[in-house]
């Protein structure tokens, strides 16, 4: 999609976490095949949305540089204690110019090219508040992927209240709203790097 004065979907790259399992390193800036993970994701996410935001609580200048080719804006959490992806999601919902926000984490370089289209179709068909990706493996086991989702920005005030009340679990907050699950059979598309070992594994895939 191309940017427009009244976009319909805002893409949100979630890059604001602590990365405790990577010794605090900024995950989105780690290299895969010589390219920062965040840039891999931006190249796949941005063509699917009308505007792009990057949720980043540190290294904002570096993320702004990576996001420049996509006219991406940087947003930071409203709180300084790294309360998790819900805080990044809230910052994105507040900053979005569109009525819908599509989020994806910064360490998933193979996300599907049809991710947003499929989430949007399900959201509309079910008149849901949230559409969330779920992977299904060869044994039909389902694995929810809550940070791959499409949400209505009208939920921002409720999310702010939930965060203020201490909620930190993404799926627990989703459960308060009408959420539709969208199945994806390509597990590889959702592989991520939560640790140095997983980053090395990504490079071998």
Curated annotation (Swiss-Prot):
Q: Which residues form a coiled coil?
A: none
Record-listed E.C. numbers: 2.7.7.77
Annotated Gene Ontology cellular component terms: cytoplasm
Principal localization?
A: cytoplasm
Which residues of the sequence carry a binding annotation for GTP?
Answer: 14-16, 27, 77, 107
Q: Report which reactions are catalysed by this protein.
A: Mo-molybdopterin + GTP + H(+) = Mo-molybdopterin guanine dinucleotide + diphosphate
Q: Quote the Pfam families the UniProt record gives.
A: NTP_transf_3
Against CDD domains, the record matches this protein to:
MobA
Question: What InterPro entries does the database record attribute to this sequence?
Answer: MobA-like_NTP_Trfase (IPR025877), Molybde_CF_guanTrfase (IPR013482), Nucleotide-diphossugar_trans (IPR029044)
Disulfide links within the chain: none
Question: Any stretches that span the bilayer, and where are they?
Answer: none
Q: Which residues bind Mg(2+)?
A: 107
Provide the GO MF annotations for this entry: GTP binding; metal ion binding; molybdenum cofactor guanylyltransferase activity
State the Gene Ontology BP annotations. Answer: bis(molybdopterin guanine dinucleotide)molybdenum biosynthetic process
Where does it localize? Cytoplasm
Write out the entry's keywords from A to Z: Cytoplasm, GTP-binding, Magnesium, Metal-binding, Molybdenum cofactor biosynthesis, Nucleotide-binding, Transferase
What does the function comment of this entry state?
Transfers a GMP moiety from GTP to Mo-molybdopterin (Mo-MPT) cofactor (Moco or molybdenum cofactor) to form Mo-molybdopterin guanine dinucleotide (Mo-MGD) cofactor.
Q: Which HAMAP family match?
A: MobA (MF_00316)
Family assignment from sequence similarity: Belongs to the MobA family.
What quaternary arrangement does the UniProt entry report?
Answer: Monomer.
Show the domain comment: The N-terminal domain determines nucleotide recognition and specific binding, while the C-terminal domain determines the specific binding to the target protein.
**Protein name in UniProt:** Molybdenum cofactor guanylyltransferase
The organism encoding this protein is: Burkholderia ambifaria (strain MC40-6)
């Amino acid at each position: 999609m191309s940017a427009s004065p009244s976009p319909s979907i805002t893409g949100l790259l979630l890059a604001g976490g602590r990365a405790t399992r990577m010794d605090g390193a900024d995950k989105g800036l780690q290299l895969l095949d010589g390219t920062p993970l965040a840039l891999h994701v931006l190249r796949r996410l941005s063509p699917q949305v009308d505007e792009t935001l990057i949720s980043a609580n540190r290294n904002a200048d570096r993320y702004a540089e990576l996001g420049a080719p996509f006219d991406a804006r940087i947003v930071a959490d409203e709180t300084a204690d790294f309360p998790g992806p819900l805080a990044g999601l809230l910052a994105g919902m507040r900053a979005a110019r569109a009525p819908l926000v599509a989020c994806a984490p910064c360490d998933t370089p193979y996300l599907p090219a049809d991710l947003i289209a499929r989430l949007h179709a399900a959201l509309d068909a079910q008149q849901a508040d949230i559409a969330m990706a779920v992977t299904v493996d060869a044994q039909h086991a389902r694995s929810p992927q809550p940070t791959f989702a499409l949400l209505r920005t009208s939920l921002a005030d409720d999310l702010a209240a939930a965060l203020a009340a201490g909620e930190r679990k993404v799926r627990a907050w989703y459960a308060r709203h009408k959420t539709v699950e969208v199945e994806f059979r390509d597990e590889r598309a959702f592989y991520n790097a939560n640790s140095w070992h997983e980053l090395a594994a990504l490079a071998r895939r």
